[in-house]
Regions:
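Conserved G/P- and acidic residue-centered "switch" motifs that form tight phosphate/ATP-binding loops
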Residues: 51, 83, 113, 139
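GNAT-family acyltransferases
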Residues: 1-78, 140-156
C-alpha cells in the first residue's frame, strides 16, 4: 500500500489510493485469468532478498482480437533506478510475445515522465505518437506519448 499511496511515485498514474480498502477493491476487480480482451491485469514486482512488494506492472489487453496490449509499470521511490522495472518489463514482454503470441505492445507515457520514457527506449520501443492535451489528469489537460514495439522487433 505504501508505494501505491505515495503521490510522488504515482504522479503520472490515474490510480492513487488513499485507503487500504481502495486497494482491496482494485484487486477484487482484477480478472482471475490473464489475456482477457478489454481488461487490465496487474502483476506485483517482489524484491527477492526481502520478499517485499516493491511495485506492479499493469497489462491492458486491447481490443477483441487479442493481438495487442499496453504496459505500464510503477516502482516504489526507494527501488527506482535499480533495474527492477527493466527486468520486470523484459520478462513480461518475453511472455507476451513468446507465450501469448502478441503482435504489438504499447506504452502510454506523460512527456514529463522521463524515467518511463528512458525505460521504454532502453527496451527498444519506438516513439509512435505525441498527442497534445488529450488526457485530463489531476485537474488539467496533459499530453501523451505512445511508444510501441512489434513482436518481430523484440530481440531480448
Amino acid at each position: 500500500f505504501s508505494y501505491r499511496s505515495d503521490s510522488e511515485t504515482n504522479k503520472y498514474q490515474g490510480f492513487v489510493p488513499k485507503k487500504l480498502q481502495e486497494i482491496d477493491e482494485f484487486i477484487a476487480k482484477n480478472p482471475l485469468e490473464i489475456n482477457r480482451p478489454g481488461t487490465w491485469f496487474q502483476l506485483v514486482i517482489i524484491e527477492k532478498e526481502t520478499d517485499k512488494i516493491i511495485g506492479d506492472l499493469g497489462i491492458h489487453f486491447i481490443g477483441d482480437d487479442g493481438f495487442q496490449c499496453e504496459l505500464g509499470c510503477t516502482i516504489s521511490k526507494e527501488h527506482q533506478g535499480k533495474g527492477f522495472a527493466t527486468k520486470a518489463m523484459k520478462i513480461t514482454i518475453d511472455y507476451l510475445f513468446n507465450t501469448l503470441n502478441k503482435h504489438r505492445i504499447t506504452g502510454s507515457i506523460d512527456p514529463d515522465n522521463i524515467s518511463s520514457i528512458r525505460l521504454f527506449e532502453r527496451l527498444k520501443f519506438r516513439r509512435e505518437a505525441h498527442f497534445k492535451n488529450n488526457l485530463f489528469h489531476d485537474g488539467k489537460w496533459v499530453d501523451e506519448i505512445i511508444y510501441g514495439i512489434l513482436k518481430s522487433e523484440w530481440k531480448h
